[in-house]
Design a protein with these regions (language model features):
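Single conserved hydrophobic/aromatic residue that forms the stacking wall/gate
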Residues: 1-19
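Iron-sulfur cluster-binding electron-transfer modules in prokaryotic oxidoreductases
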Residues: 17-199
Length: 199
């Protein structure tokens, strides 16, 4: 068992190195202070795996950047939005990197927004179904993961399901539409909700 696991790990490490090295070369060719990622998967890889390959950068997720801008008064959501938002914690943002309060802080800064939590949220959040390349898998047994998660989101009564991951957005949006709620409920990145609040 351990030999097989080590062999799989070796293949995975080789694959990461093959993909990462051209990106590391590109990053070395430009000058920057911080790298901002909107994808939690990319954020996690560059922040936590690239240092072992020689890529040690300050990496922040756009939820952290938006929180910083709101707290420092450089971003002032002003449009009074009357609506309810539930936030879906992406796995690689919430559970893996503990970025949990930041997206909620951004949403709380928008006048008129009422936040409601799903039953499984924050550190105990539930996957959208895209992880592990399941986004491209047609599940034949049981309920699709994105359908289960979206039903939980719809059960909150929110008119916006917000997240901070492009993969989660696709999975949740597909399931909202499959549930026949596409005209009633929007799926939006937190940055889109902020943009909407700017008038």
């Amino acid at each position: 068992f351990f030999q097989a696991e080590d062999g799989i790990r070796d293949v995975a490490v080789t694959g990461v190195q093959t993909c990462a090295l051209p990106i590391l070369e590109l990053l070395k060719s430009v000058s920057f202070k911080s790298l901002v990622a909107n994808c939690p998967h990319c954020f996690n890889t560059i922040k936590n795996e690239y240092p072992a390959l020689g890529g040690d950068y300050e990496v922040i997720h756009h939820a952290e950047l938006l929180t910083h801008l709101v707290k420092n008064g450089r971003l002032r959501p002003g449009f009074n939005y009357k609506g309810t938002v539930t936030y879906h914690d992406p796995c690689y943002l919430g559970r893996h990197n503990r970025i949990i309060l930041e997206p909620r802080t951004v949403l709380a800064a928008i006048p008129g927004v009422t936040q409601v939590e799903m039953g499984r949220c924050r550190e105990k959040g539930f996957c959208c179904g895209a992880g592990g390349a399941r986004m491209w898998l047609e599940e034949n047994i049981g309920k699709r993961v994105n359908m289960e998660r979206t039903e939980e989101a719809l059960g909150t009564g929110a008119d916006i399901v917000s997240t901070a991951c492009p993969f989660c957005m696709i999975m949740l949006d597909d399931a909202v539409k499959a549930n026949g709620k596409g005209d009633e409920v929007s799926v939006m990145d937190i940055s889109q909700v902020v943009e909407k609040s700017l008038g």
